[in-house]
Amino acid sequence: MQLRHHLILTGAAAGLIAAGPATAQSVDVSITVPRLTVAEYHKPYVAVYLEATGAPARTLSIWYDVAKAKDEGRKWLNEVRGWWRASGRTGSYIADGSSGATRAPGVQKISVNAARLGGLKPGQYTLVIEAAREVGGREVVRLPFTWPLKPGQTIQAAGKTELGAVSATFKP
């Protein structure tokens, strides 16, 4: 059974929608976690966050070992150093639904909805992806951009060791 919904806007609401330029409302982030050939491999802890000059960092996602007994996985979050200093030590990332398990090698995707991006003022931002691995290295990839972006715009960069290709596509 297929349901259809129609929303008809009239008056001022219709005028605002028709007249305003299209801007991105959500972002799809793609992160490549490379498979490293090392004697002892551990999946990395990864933080995805937004930085803006003069504003607190905004955590979009944090992957860590959430399944460890007695919440032991949180003990190592400070190894994701840049994120930890910028926002992690406040502990608010746990309550806001942004945390999840570490992820296996391969291309990993997350979507950040408009509510999580809400309130971004026009200006310069940096999307930061930071990875740290037990018995391994640490790497930070930065994707600078100017907000608001037009829907369909993609920003990309690549890491060298702990992260591979990273991209963010902004959607209406």
Predicted regions and their residues:
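Structural beta-strand segments of beta-rich domains
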Residues: 25-29, 44-46
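Beta-strand signatures of extracellular beta-sandwich domains
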Residues: 47-49, 61, 128
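Short amphipathic, basic-aromatic surface patches that mediate peripheral association
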Residues: 29-41, 64-67
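Short coil-to-beta strand junction motifs in C2/discoidin
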Residues: 40-47, 124
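Sec/Tat signal peptide C-region and signal peptidase I cleavage site
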Residues: 20-24
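Bacterial N-terminal signal peptides that target proteins for export
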Residues: 1-10
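Structured domain cores in non-transmembrane regions
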Residues: 54-120
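Glycine-rich, aromatic-bearing surface loops/beta-hairpins
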Residues: 105-107, 115-172
